Design a protein with these regions (language model features):
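Membrane-embedded beta-strand positions of outer-membrane beta-barrel proteins
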Residues: 20-22, 53-55, 88-92, 110, ...
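Cleavable N-terminal export/targeting peptides
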Residues: 1-15
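Transmembrane beta-strands of outer-membrane beta-barrel pores
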Residues: 24-28, 46, 57-61, 92-98, ...
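Residues that define the transmembrane beta-barrel architecture of outer-membrane proteins
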Residues: 16, 32-36, 67-71, 104-108, ...
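Repeated loop/turn-to-beta-strand initiation elements of outer-membrane beta-barrel proteins
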Residues: 16, 47-53, 83-88, 119-124, ...
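Structural signature of outer-membrane beta-barrel channels/translocons
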Residues: 27, 41-47, 78-82, 95, ...
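Outer-membrane beta-barrel "beta-signal"
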Residues: 206, 221-233
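Outer-membrane beta-barrel transmembrane domain signature
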Residues: 122-204
Length: 233
């Protein structure tokens, strides 16, 4: 919650870059399916820190019936330490989802990062390890006996690659074990590819795929893939 309040203050800073991504698809073969997604992303980078924020809205219908309706907000901060390769991070996420076993979910993770590899040559790429702990807090649970507050660990990797000036590929994989029993856990996987179509206009083609799996809440585990147009604001 502290990082959520800090995020609001940080967003007031002028030194931010914002991007808008729009994705839409529709089909009318065996059934009529319509989906859309809106991402508003922001980032701020300095020598000693970096911040990332995201607001995502997703909606879908099939044969006139609503099949998806969720909103997610994220804020992540990374701070470099005096020790080379080491750093600290804070990751806050808040989600409202009509079609899960909960109405709202707040997650918070704090911990350390270690830079496994970094290449600043023509093909820039880096790989970081992430480790720490935090919690998830759910409301509106379908199961009245389920715990609303659960402490969690956080282990994972994240990296990025720039094969050329126009291509950027990012990916991350995180495991969140339930510290109350360790038999339950969450995983989150994300892959993001961006191709710059028009550098002057800040227009890009973006393909994003993510998957979340939760053994305790039976969160949908299917890949969420979207082809989007991204523009700099």
């Amino acid at each position: 919650m502290i990082t959520t309040l800090a995020a609001l203050a940080l967003l007031a800073d002028d030194d931010w870059n914002f991007k808008l991504s729009l994705g839409f698809d529709a089909s009318g073969d065996a059934q009529t399916v319509t989906n859309f997604r809106v991402d508003i992303e922001g980032d701020q980078k300095a020598e000693d820190h970096s911040y990332e924020t995201l607001l995502r809205i997703q909606y879908g219908e099939s044969e006139g019936e609503r099949i998806r309706n969720d909103v997610e907000a994220r804020f992540r901060g990374d701070w470099k330490s005096d020790e080379e390769r080491w750093g600290l991070f804070s990751d806050t996420r808040f989600r409202i989802d009509e079609f899960q076993n909960f109405d709202t979910r707040l997650t918070e993770s704090l911990g350390g990062t270690y830079q496994i590899y970094e290449n600043e040559g023509d093909k820039k790429w880096n790989l970081d390890a992430v480790f720490g702990g935090g919690f998830r807090l759910d409301s509106g649970l379908i199961d009245p006996n389920a715990d609303e507050f659960v402490p969690e660990g956080n282990i994972g990797f994240r990296g990025s690659m720039e094969p050329s000036e126009r291509h950027v590929l990012k990916g991350s994989l995180f495991l969140y074990p339930d510290l109350d029993g360790l038999e339950d856990y969450r995983t989150f996987t994300n892959i993001d590819w961006n191709y710059m179509l028009d550098p002057d206009q800040g227009l890009s083609l973006r393909i994003n795929a993510d998957q979340e799996y939760d053994t305790a809440r039976l969160v949908r585990s299917a890949w969420n893939v979207k082809v989007m147009v991204q523009m700099e604001l």
